Amino acid sequence: NKGLDYGDIAIVFPYNKKKLKNGKTIYFQYLLRKALDDVNIPYIIGDDDLTKHAKKTGITLSNLYFIKNLEYKAVVFCELEMLYNQTINKEDQDYQINDFIGDLNKIYMVINRASEYLTITTTFNENSSELIKILVNSINT
């Protein structure tokens, strides 16, 4: 408990859904909504109508595009695995560099939405993701 209201918190994820290799689709926003409903925590869904002046009556659940111009005291950024370009292969380097930089810019945009607290959750580490390696190195310098 850090003295935050629910409206001070955003849970952000790259995309609302992800298609798995086995063909199934995970609806990440639905999973978050269900988890918060189960423990009676109020939330709002980030959309085009959400502005910095809007009254936030609960935790904001949003993909990264809808919080672009907003600020929260606390941001939880999860499911970085949904970003496609975790590493750059030497063979596919030309087109992957632009995509990699685009994903890095998305991460930068999200982490700058937090004014006091930032939590990043991921199953990746510095060895499995260049994006995570860059984040860890920037924190440690």
What are these regions (language model features)?
Residues N1-T119, F124-T141:
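Core RecA-like ATPase module of SF1/SF2 helicases and allied nucleic-acid translocases
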